[in-house]
Amino acid sequence: MSGSTFGNLFAVTNFGESHGPAIGCVIDGCPPGLALTEADIQTDLDRRRPGTSRHVTQRNEPDAVEILSGVYEGKTTGTPICLLIRNTDQRSKDYGNILETFRPGHADYSYLHKYGRRDPRGGGRASARLTAPMVAAGAVAKKWLAEKYGTSFRGCMAQIGDIAIPFESWEHVPRNPFFAPVADVSHLEDYMDALRKAGDSCGARIRVTASGVPVGLGEPLFDKLDADIAFAMMGINAVKGVEIGAGFASVTQRGTTHGDSLSPEGFLSNNAGGVLGGISTGQDLEVSIAIKPTSSIITPRQSIDTAGNPAEVVTKGRHDPCVGIRATPIAEAMLALVVMEHALRQRAQNADVTVSTPDIMRARG
């Protein structure tokens, strides 16, 4: 009820605060028998963690995950899995000057009016640090889906600020700090260096895709696969928009173009983004998210204090000038959690369903 749990059959309860002793999650519903070690999870956490380049926050957290329960002799037991990530590099004194003021664009004002109190240190529960446990949970989902169906997830940065990034190759993504699918990122580095010197921030657009998704995942009406994907992506800090498939470009398309024609060898296009009627087609799930500029910047801005008086706010501390730089593994994780949830639902309800029509995407593969 408090909004800290994502999913039902694969339920992930997120806990902790940015400057508390630890953050983490409890996964309830992971099938038993999955070989799982901390190393399986750490790979994705390392992709998301702070302090990895000059273009992200310099808060130096190792984000080392600890498996506290739900795994015995290297395999999941089917009972709740508790994953813990200790906070080691908090610097709460940086927030002393904003205890009685509200940062524009941040959750300070809304949290205070909801709860009657707030934790200003790093944003408390509103901090993007709380995405780390979701990345950890997503790594578990990714592993199960890969072994069960051969499903894989990957993402990249498609735009940063006003710079559109053309897609060249997935091979480039892990080779630069931006998750950019291009060989040369010097122009992105120059852009971010200038932005940091100006004391400002920028937004980003992230593309994430899932391949090898079984056909038939998703439910009619209110539990559509694409509806749950949008819900999951909007749960990521700073996300302000979600597109699936052609997204808003569908407005300018015509039916002769937008409808994905079928052939015995597979679909001829993927404007639907891998979902028709809320149910997966077996094509790649194609999702894009829009991320707003970081709210915490050192440029003075107009605000009010807790008494309602005018105030000028300057946010000190260590912050990402573009939170989108580290968002790619987060978006991958949330997509994996949605696919995992619906895979378990499909297995529970329709495991015995057979149809005579061939699965054209599997046949092609």
Swiss-Prot record:
NCBIfam families: aroC, PRK05382.1. FMN binds at R125, A126, S127, N237, A238, G277, K292, P293, T294, S295, S296, R318. This is Chorismate synthase. Pathway: Metabolic intermediate biosynthesis; chorismate biosynthesis; chorismate from D-erythrose 4-phosphate and phosphoenolpyruvate: step 7/7. Homotetramer. It catalyses: 5-O-(1-carboxyvinyl)-3-phosphoshikimate = chorismate + phosphate. The keyword NADP applies. Gene3D superfamilies: Chorismate synthase AroC. Its EC number is 4.2.3.5. SUPFAM superfamilies: Chorismate synthase, AroC. It is an enzyme of class 4 (lyase). Reduced FMN (FMNH(2)). Belongs to the chorismate synthase family. The lineage of its organism: Bacteria, Pseudomonadati, Pseudomonadota, Betaproteobacteria, Burkholderiales. NADP(+) binds at R48, R54. CDD domains: Chorismate_synthase (cd07304). GO terms for biological process: amino acid biosynthetic process; aromatic amino acid family biosynthetic process; chorismate biosynthetic process. Keywords: Amino-acid biosynthesis, Aromatic amino acid biosynthesis, FAD, Flavoprotein, FMN, Lyase, NADP. GO terms for molecular function: chorismate synthase activity; FMN binding. It comes from the Bacteria. GO terms for cellular component: cytosol. Its cofactor is FMNH2. This reaction introduces a second double bond into the aromatic ring system. It holds the Pfam family Chorismate_synt. It comes from Polaromonas sp. (strain JS666 / ATCC BAA-500).
